[in-house]
Amino acid sequence: MRFSLRPLIARCTLAVALPLAVVGTIAALTFTTAATSSVAHAQQMPPGAKQPGDFPHVKLTAGMFVIDAAVAANDADREQGLMYRTQLAPNEGMLFAFGENAVHCFWMKNTLIPLSIAFMRADGTITDIDEMQAETTNNHCPRNNGTYALEMSKGWFTTKGIKPGMKMQGLPPLQ
């Protein structure tokens, strides 16, 4: 009787090659999807828009919580705000500083994540807190005049027990 290894080698090659081909295809699709998502997200960012790390930052305290806040203190930065961001770190937010004590309204156009906002007087006293849905053009206005507003991830103020009447510490001087 004659024995040939050729059929056995063919079966083993197929048994190894097929799973490798499937894994390779899945990896290629995953890479293509990730690259496409990054490109699509990058295309949404308008020319001249600041990246998150390009804003000046301050450390604020609300009760026992330390907040890393990007500061938007000029018209261009306030207009961009947190637009185009897809996430925030747990205690990350954006502080809007205004040169005048007035009612400053916000909307969520091109803002991809839902946010909470606290409106404050110059001394850091929180006057109003509001919840804002992503990608809407509804106005969110405080009932009181103020000079600062702090945007955080949706529900942040509620879950931390931060309420109107409490004070925010570490606010930068107004210009």
Language-model regions, residue ranges each:
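Intrinsically disordered, low-complexity segments enriched in Ser/Pro/Gly/Ala and basic residues
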Residues: 3, 36-37, 152
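Short, amphipathic alpha-helical segments
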Residues: 19, 26-32, 59-60
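Boundary at the C-terminal end of the N-terminal hydrophobic targeting segment
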Residues: 28, 34-42
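Bacterial N-terminal signal peptides that target proteins for export
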Residues: 2-25
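Compact, glycine-rich, soluble single-domain proteins
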Residues: 41-175
